Each structure stands twice: as structure tokens, then as C-alpha cells.
Amino acid sequence: METVALIDYGSGNLRSPAKALERAAAGCHASFQVLVTSDADAVRKADRVVLPAVGAFADCKRGLSEVPGMQLMAEGGREYGVTEGLGWIKGEVVKLEPADPTLKIPHMGWNELDIRREHPVLAGLRERAHAYFVHSYRFAVERPEDVIASADYGGPFAAVVGRDNLVGTQFHPEKSQETGLALVANFLTWRV
């Protein structure tokens, strides 16, 4: 049985992402133990690691020196001041500023994914799949080839980024119903 470590960095409720991982594993008939942990040794030993999308860039980075999700893969961010990221994917996290001033921030709701390139975690997603977003900042990715899918909210933004064995989503897979569960199942069965 493989282990998926869901990192608990003390910044939010992890029940929803843990349940999504369990449902996706059952749906793809994969044998995974979901371990919610803040123990660095357990994370190192895990077969897969998930950084849930709860909390803010600066709070989580400063509080634990662990990464809360896609945005911390960036070189830096500007949420709650300038914060250094991990630099795994070139780019910066900046305020979401839609061209249409009537659009509200934070962006909360369903958006269509525009798949830019093939990737195993998006395999089998239906064309124009929708995902659920809640965010006020976006990852301004420097290299277009690192954007796997985008969405639009008064202008395009990176919805899924990835390189090598790393993938991050701006949306909440655990709240994105069929699309999210398919992505999580693909992640669990993905072989690099």
C-alpha cells in the first residue's frame, strides 16, 4: 500500500482534501493510505505528497517553512507583503486584477479550464471541464511551457502548472466535483 502525505501546516481544515483523496483512490481502485501529518520524516517517506490549498502564501511559508500549494512553487509572492517562494517554477504570485472592474475579488466560483498541453493528471478530463476557484492572487508564470491549463476571470491566469514531477492547481480539486476527483485519481496513478 502506498502512502499519500497530506501536509498539515496548521492553516485550515484538511477533512475535505483528505476525503477527496480517499474517494479518488477508491474510484481508481488504487491502494493508498492517506496520512494527514506535519511530521517531516513521514512526508519524506511518503510515496506522494499533497500540499492542500488552504491558508495564505505568507502565513504558511513563515509559520512552518512548508509549502501550502501551487503558489509556493513560485519564486516569490506579494500576498501580505513580499515573501520568498521555493522557486520550483519560475514566476511570481501577484494580485488578481481583472480587466472588468465589476468582477469581484476574491474570485469565487466555477470556471472553465483551457487545457494548454497534455499532462497525465488531466488525462480523460472532458473538453471544457469546470473547476471551483477561490482566490485573490494568481501565479504569473514566467515560462509558458509550465502552464498546463488556464482559466479566465477578466483575463487569463494559470489554473494548473507543472514541470517534471511537480503539479499544482489554483483551483480546489476537493470542491471541483467530477473534474477534481478525476484529477486527484490521475495524480494517484501517475508514474513519472
Curated annotation (Swiss-Prot):
Signal peptide: none annotated. PROSITE patterns: GATASE_TYPE_1. Its EC number is 4.3.2.10, 3.5.1.2. Residues 3-192 form the Glutamine amidotransferase type-1 domain. One of its GO terms (biological process) is L-histidine biosynthetic process. It catalyses: 5-[(5-phospho-1-deoxy-D-ribulos-1-ylimino)methylamino]-1-(5-phospho-beta-D-ribosyl)imidazole-4-carboxamide + L-glutamine = D-erythro-1-(imidazol-4-yl)glycerol 3-phosphate + 5-amino-1-(5-phospho-beta-D-ribosyl)imidazole-4-carboxamide + L-glutamate + H(+); L-glutamine + H2O = L-glutamate + NH4(+). One of its GO terms (molecular function) is glutaminase activity. It comes from Azospirillum brasilense. Pathway: Amino-acid biosynthesis; L-histidine biosynthesis; L-histidine from 5-phospho-alpha-D-ribose 1-diphosphate: step 5/9. HAMAP family: HisH. The active site is at residues 172, 174. The keyword Hydrolase applies. GO terms for cellular component: cytoplasm. Disulfide bonds: none annotated. IGPS catalyzes the conversion of PRFAR and glutamine to IGP, AICAR and glutamate. The HisH subunit catalyzes the hydrolysis of glutamine to glutamate and ammonia as part of the synthesis of IGP and AICAR. The resulting ammonia molecule is channeled to the active site of HisF. Heterodimer of HisH and HisF. This is Imidazole glycerol phosphate synthase subunit HisH. The keyword Zinc does not apply. It comes from the Bacteria. Keywords: Amino-acid biosynthesis, Cytoplasm, Glutamine amidotransferase, Histidine biosynthesis, Hydrolase, Lyase.
